């Protein structure tokens, strides 16, 4: 396994990360793994040298964090980088979500209890709330860093102009700054290449993209799996005619290289400038093994052009 700095920080993370959305309670999503199933995936990730695990308070209504907390007890805390997120609805009250100082302080304390740890390595905003007071959010996040409950800050899926506003607010006031962005990025979704990716490269912010194989669309696993059959959101993201052309190009390159489509798709993400550690949401050991093997696959410039040539821009999400 290769280890790289997360953006301009001194924190070293593995070149691939383990996503824990699939760890939790089947009453939340039928395809998630229980504690023992999650343990098998986690142990294999450790064997591969993966040291960054990403979860969220919202996943399985907190159960994912509880499972991650149980799993990290098996290894020295210093060897694991734990990332989690806040901002999602965690109750019925009007302040049980979002990025007010009140909710952020309550959310971090609840996450620490579920994780069973004294600190969170990377604390990230998650589902964006347009009414957020950015100055209040950044000042509250800075206070969490100063208390020692949080070591580093990150964001997930925020409109670029608001991200830049928050970033420069923190810079002007000498506050703790974002070191990472978790964004939706793969061969079928490249919208962030216009603004977010260049900005992050210029400012020294690490990129830990999710869905590097587009929920299975890029490797022919988009149908017939339990998640695909129960997750309608996948088909709102992917499935355009141009997506089929990209998928065919992935299959063509994979055949010529003697690799799997998943490995080609992941190798493409890994070779993009500024990408630090794509997140693997594996719930099967063989898929995790397959993904790790992509680290040894280097695409030629001609292959990259072949993969990128069919992309059609998408409407803005925000």
Give the location of each predicted region.
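N-terminal binding-site loop/beta-alpha segment at the start of enzyme catalytic domains
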Residues: 1-80, 316
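Active-site groove signature of glycoside hydrolases
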Residues: 112-131
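A short, structured active-site edge motif that brings together acidic residues
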Residues: 78-91, 181-184
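Beta/alpha (TIM)-barrel catalytic core signal, keyed to glycine-rich beta->alpha loops juxtaposed to Asp/Glu
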Residues: 3, 130-314, 318
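Active-site mouth loops of central-metabolism enzymes
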Residues: 23-36, 90-102, 126-132
């Amino acid at each position: 396994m290769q280890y790289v700095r997360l953006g301009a920080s001194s924190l070293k993370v593995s070149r691939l990360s383990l996503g824990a959305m699939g760890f939790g309670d089947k009453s939340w999503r039928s395809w998630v793994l229980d504690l023992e199933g999650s343990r098998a995936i986690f142990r294999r990730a450790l064997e591969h040298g993966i040291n960054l695990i990403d979860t969220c308070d919202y996943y399985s209504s907190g159960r994912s964090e509880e499972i991650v907390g149980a799993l990290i007890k098996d290894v020295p805390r210093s060897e694991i980088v734990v990332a989690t997120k806040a901002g999602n609805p965690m109750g019925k009250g009007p302040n049980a979500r979002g990025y007010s100082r009140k909710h952020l302080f309550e959310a971090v304390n609840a996450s620490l209890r579920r994780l069973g740890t004294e600190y969170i390595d990377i604390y990230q905003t998650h589902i964006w709330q347009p009414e957020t007071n950015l100055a209040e959010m950044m000042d509250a996040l800075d206070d969490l860093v100063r208390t020692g409950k949080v070591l580093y800050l990150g964001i997930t899926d925020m409109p670029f102009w608001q991200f830049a506003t928050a970033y420069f607010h923190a810079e002007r006031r000498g506050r703790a700054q974002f070191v990472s962005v978790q964004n939706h990025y793969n061969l079928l979704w490249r919208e962030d290449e216009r603004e977010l990716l260049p900005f992050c490269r210029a400012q020294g912010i690490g990129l830990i993209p999710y869905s590097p194989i587009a929920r299975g669309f890029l490797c022919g696993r988009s149908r017939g799996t339990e998640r695909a059959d129960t997750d309608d959101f996948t088909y709102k993201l992917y499935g355009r005619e141009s997506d089929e052309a990209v998928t065919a190009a992935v299959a063509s390159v994979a055949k010529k290289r003697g690799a799997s489509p998943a490995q080609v798709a992941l190798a493409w993400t890994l070779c993009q400038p500024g990408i630090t550690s794509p997140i693997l949401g594996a719930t099967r050991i063989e898929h995790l093994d397959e993904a790790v093997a992509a680290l040894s696959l280097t695409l030629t410039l001609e292959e990259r052009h072949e993969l990128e040539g069919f992309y059609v821009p998408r409407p803005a999400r925000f």
